[in-house]
Structure formats: C-alpha cells, structure tokens
Amino acid sequence: MIYYSNYYGGYGYGGLGCGYGCGYRGYGCGYGGYGGYGNGYYCPSCYGRYWSYGFY
C-alpha cells in the first residue's frame, strides 16, 4: 500500500508534500507518518518530487 501526495504540499494520506521539503507537517524524512506526526503506522520517504508512504 503506497500513497502519494502532490508535489506542492498536497494533502494526500499523511498530509505531507515534498514541495515543503520532507517536513511540512512532520519532522523530516525520519518522521511524519499518517497525520504528519510519526505515529508508527506509516513510514514516509521522499523520492524526488513525491512522498511515498508504506507500512513499516
């Protein structure tokens, strides 16, 4: 299961966007899972222009 938000800070699953530098609502690529606060259900990674979400 992988979800994408758009480049310019789109609110996809997790509410993050790479347009805001891997940490618009979260705290960098190491944090900011579902809802943007790293609750452990999703692990975000930044691939180029898109956030990619996948389960741990």
From Swiss-Prot:
Gene Ontology, cellular component aspect: cytosol; intermediate filament
Signal sequence, renumbered to the chain: none
Pfam families assigned to the protein according to its UniProt record, in alphabetical order: KRTAP
Keyword annotations: Keratin, Repeat
Entry function: In the hair cortex, hair keratin intermediate filaments are embedded in an interfilamentous matrix, consisting of hair keratin-associated proteins (KRTAP), which are essential for the formation of a rigid and resistant hair shaft through their extensive disulfide bond cross-linking with abundant cysteine residues of hair keratins. The matrix proteins include the high-sulfur and high-glycine-tyrosine keratins.
Subunit structure comment from the entry: Interacts with hair keratins.
Family to which the UniProt record says this protein belongs: Belongs to the KRTAP type 20 family.
Protein name (record): Keratin-associated protein 20-1
Organism: Homo sapiens (Human)
